[in-house]
């Protein structure tokens, strides 16, 4: 299903900014009517929203949850009789996103929220233009745990401005959030590979904003970029950090998406670079 199209955020690594069009949303009533139709006609009780975010409009998202709760009451159904999952953006209390809103979504049936956590560093998060802080993330995570809502973490290692200290903050976050893995409120984590510059993302068109340089005279793209102001962040270092993040998460019991396959690929690439046998881009990557 879809709640909306486009996105209200402008993360500079995401091509939704340019490919998704402007943000537009259905009303909470429209989405509720669709959910009600599939439940009453086909018995569907578990829904997944396939859009970039389900809570782009706090007003319509709250209205949807209120209508679900009203429906449960009118039909003598328990809270969370219907469940829904989808991509979700983090907001802080200063944006009007209240604890009562999270409590409402939990009772209505919010199940597994896919969230771009990306990093444990506010410095990196601000550089990404994520639009929220670590305190905001903690605020939502604490409430999710109280309201039986799960979080699926999307992480990003090796962003161009990520320093050793920033990466340590990511490791600290992974360690600190292990309590939510133990409680079942973190359903999994996807580390991806390492940070890549995708065509269509703002950073692809404006690498100068982070003063990035390409290699071989080309525009910075994929993993082929250099940040002269963060020169120790070589491709080898990015892979090293990415491996370290997964090894820690694995040790702490995080369910990791394609864990073995990703780790084997990363270790192979790291070894090729260390041995000087990564021939395809050997001149581009400095150890």
Regions found by a protein language model. Give the residues of each.
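Alpha-helix termini
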Residues: 69-78, 176-187
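Radical SAM [4Fe-4S] cluster-binding motif and immediate context
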Residues: 1-151
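Catalytic cores of alpha/beta
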Residues: 101, 161-176
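Radical SAM enzyme core and accessory elements
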Residues: 218-287
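Short, surface-exposed amphipathic charged segments that create phosphate/polyanion-binding patches used
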Residues: 100-103, 204-212, 273-274
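C-terminal, active-site-flanking charged/polar segments
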Residues: 134-137, 172-180, 193-199
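Flexible glycine/acidic-rich beta-alpha junction loops that bind and position SAM and/or redox cofactors
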Residues: 9, 58-59, 126-128, 157-165, ...
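Short beta-strand segments at enzyme active-site cores
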Residues: 46-49, 151-155, 187-192
């Amino acid at each position: 299903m879809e709640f909306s199209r486009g996105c209200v955020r402008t993360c500079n690594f995401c091509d939704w900014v340019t490919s998704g069009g402007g943000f537009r949303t259905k009303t909470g009533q429209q989405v509720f009517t669709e959910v009600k139709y599939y439940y009453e006609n086909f018995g569907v009780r578990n829904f997944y929203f396939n859009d970039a975010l389900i809570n782009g409009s706090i007003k319509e998202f709250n209205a949807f949850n209120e209508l679900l709760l009203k429906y449960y009451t009118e039909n003598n159904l328990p809270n969370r009789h219907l469940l829904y999952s989808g991509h979700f953006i983090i907001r802080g209390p200063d944006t009007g996103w209240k604890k009562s809103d999270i409590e409402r979504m939990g009772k209505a049936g919010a199940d597994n929220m896919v969230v771009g956590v990306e990093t444990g560093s506010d410095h990196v998060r601000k550089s990404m233009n994520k639009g929220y802080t670590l305190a905001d993330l903690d605020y939502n995570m604490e409430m999710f745990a109280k309201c039986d809502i799960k979080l699926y973490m999307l992480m990003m290692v090796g962003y161009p401005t990520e320093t050793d200290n920033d990466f340590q903050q990511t490791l600290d976050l992974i360690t600190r959030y292990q309590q939510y893995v133990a409680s079942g409120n973190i359903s999994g984590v996807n580390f991806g590979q390492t940070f890549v510059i995708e065509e269509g993302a703002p950073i692809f068109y404006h690498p100068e904003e982070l003063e990035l340089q390409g290699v071989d005279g080309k525009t910075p793209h994929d993993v082929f970029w250099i940040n002269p102001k963060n020169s120790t962040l070589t491709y080898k270092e990015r892979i090293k950090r990415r491996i370290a993040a997964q090894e820690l998460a694995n040790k702490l019991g995080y369910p990791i998406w394609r864990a073995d396959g990703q780790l084997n690929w990363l270790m192979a690439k790291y070894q090729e670079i260390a041995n000087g046998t990564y021939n395809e881009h050997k001149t581009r990557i400095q150890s």
